[in-house]
Every structure is written in structure tokens, then in C-alpha cells.
A protein has these predicted regions:
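A hydrophobic/aromatic-rich effector-binding and dimerization subdomain
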Residues: 1-21, 66-135, 152-157
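Short, conserved beta-strand element in jelly-roll/cupin
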Residues: 30-47
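Short acidic-glycine-tyrosine-enriched beta hairpin
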Residues: 51-65
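Short hydrophobic/aromatic patch on the recognition helix
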Residues: 59, 202-203, 207
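All-alpha amphipathic helical-bundle segments outside canonical DNA-binding/catalytic cores
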Residues: 133-150, 169
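Terminal helix-turn-helix DNA-binding modules in bacterial transcription factors
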Residues: 177, 181, 186, 190, ...
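The alpha-helix within a helix-turn-helix
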Residues: 193
Length: 238
């Protein structure tokens, strides 16, 4: 396998990449309008989803839904290898009209239950599906779809065994959840600081550490994705 390849069409955006000396500054916090399945294949780092830190081990899988902010805090000391696939919900509509395969992405709070490890799966079949998607094929789209669907089914089965545990949320997590619940409201630093009894400097510090974005950048990114989703669904965002 080469150190880099991409496949893109109307429904799928898939890539494999290896950086011998990763540059942490190149990996910025971002969101997507699509669903993402990310596989960490090698390196050293922490993946952060909506402020939740996930220390990584080779073979870890993470899932993110549209507008779920994420980035990797990568160490430059080791080569960084990863595989990711982004896909639209339309890809699954005719196959899975009840949304079973998207349940792990949707039926949870932001920044929770993003990480899947070997112990979460009943068998090692999921590894085969990942390997197959990264192999050369005369019809890459067919190869991707015929392996993505059973992989999503394995993740869905693993998700059903997970139990919701009440966790005392950190301040940054509470603020992130508050912003997402009120993303259409008149949000400002003053409003957030008044609600959580903190100074603007403290808010900006903990928020940037958790998300790699400023509060304003985060709100803008979320609103842009929400507006695009409304437009795609035929609804005016105003």
C-alpha cells in the first residue's frame, strides 16, 4: 500500500495517509456535513471530539456525526498513519431505511461513545472490512460499500452493548453542550460567562484547550454546518 491515496465520489470521501513526521499545527479542529469513520493505525496522540479526550491506540475506531467538532492532538515523535471515510446519509437510505446503521452516530450525546476498540467487538471481522477497503480494486466504490456496510453493522452491534453512564461533566464539556443546545440563540461571551460565573479570559483559555477553537470560531462553524443542512433539506435557514 502507498503512503497516500484518496477516493471521492458524490457520496463517499475516503483516504489513507502516513506522515513520517507529523506536524501538530497542521491538524486543526473541524466539522463535516457528513458522517465520518476514522481508524487510527499508528502514531501517538489524543483525539478530541467536542472537548472529550480519547487517548489513542493502534486499531482504534472513532465515529463522528455531522457538525461534531473533532481534531487530533498528535505527537511529532512517531509516524502517524490513519484511514478515514466520510459518507452521506443518502448512501444508506435505500439499504437501511430505519436508520439502524446510523444509530451509533445519532443516538448519543455529542462527544460521547465516539471510540471503539477491539474489546467492543465480538469478533475480529471488523478488521477485515477495514483492510478490504484500503486494498486496490478495479471498482473502488463497490469495494468500499460492500465492506463499509458490514463494518457499520459491527459498530451498531457494539454500540447496543454500551450502557449510558452518568459522568460528572467537566466545565468545558458543560459549556460545549450548552452552546450546542442554544446554537440558534443570541450567544456571546458575556452570556456564557454570566451563566457559568467565569471570566472571559478563563472561558477562552479552557475552551481553546478543549476544542482548539475560539468560542466565536466554534459557534460560527456550528452555525454554518446547521445552515447548510437546512439548505440541503430544502428549508431556508432564515
Amino acid at each position: 500500500m502507498s503512503d497516500f491515496f484518496l477516493y471521492r465520489d458524490n457520496d463517499i470521501d475516503m483516504g489513507y495517509r502516513r506522515d513520517e513526521t507529523p506536524v501538530p499545527e497542521h491538524f486543526k479542529a473541524h466539522t463535516h456535513e457528513t458522517y465520518e469513520l476514522y481508524c487510527f493505525l499508528g502514531g501517538k496522540g489524543i483525539y478530541r471530539v467536542e472537548g472529550t479526550p480519547y487517548p489513542l491506540k493502534a486499531g482504534d475506531i472513532l465515529i463522528m456525526r455531522p457538525a461534531e467538532s473533532h481534531y487530533i492532538d498528535i505527537s511529532p515523535d512517531r509516524p502517524y498513519t490513519r484511514f478515514s471515510i466520510n459518507f452521506k446519509a443518502e448512501l444508506l437510505k435505500g439499504i437501511d431505511p430505519k436508520g439502524h446503521l446510523l444509530s451509533p452516530f445519532i443516538n448519543r450525546k455529542l462527544g460521547t461513545f465516539n471510540l471503539y476498540r477491539a474489546e467492543n467487538f465480538k469478533t475480529d471481522a471488523y478488521k477485515l472490512f477495514i483492510d478490504n477497503m484500503t486494498e486496490n480494486s478495479p471498482d473502488r466504490r463497490v469495494q468500499i460499500i460492500t465492506n463499509l456496510l458490514p463494518l457499520l453493522n459491527e459498530i451498531s452491534a457494539a454500540f447496543e452493548t454500551m450502557s449510558e453512564i452518568q459522568i460528572d461533566q467537566t466545565l468545558d464539556s458543560r459549556i460545549i453542550n450548552y452552546i450546542n443546545r442554544h446554537i440558534s440563540d443570541n450567544l456571546s461571551l458575556d452570556v456564557i460567562c454570566e451563566r457559568y460565573y467565569i471570566s472571559k479570559s478563563h472561558l477562552c483559555h479552557i475552551f481553546k484547550k478543549a476544542t482548539a477553537m475560539t468560542v466565536c470560531e466554534y459557534i460560527t462553524a456550528k452555525r454554518l454546518v446547521a445552515a447548510k443542512q437546512l439548505i440541503l433539506s430544502g428549508i431556508s435557514p432564515t
